Amino acid sequence: STAGDTHLGGEDF
């Protein structure tokens, strides 16, 4: 994931 991961599971969305 990227430095902007703030979603569930820490995935990129």
Curated annotation (Swiss-Prot):
Disulfide bonds: none annotated. The keyword Transcription regulation does not apply. It is found in: Nucleus matrix. Keywords: ATP-binding, Chaperone, Nucleotide-binding, Nucleus, Stress response. One of its GO terms (cellular component) is nuclear matrix. The keyword Hydrolase does not apply. One of its GO terms (molecular function) is ATP binding. Belongs to the heat shock protein 70 family. Chaperone. This is Heat shock cognate 71 kDa protein 2.
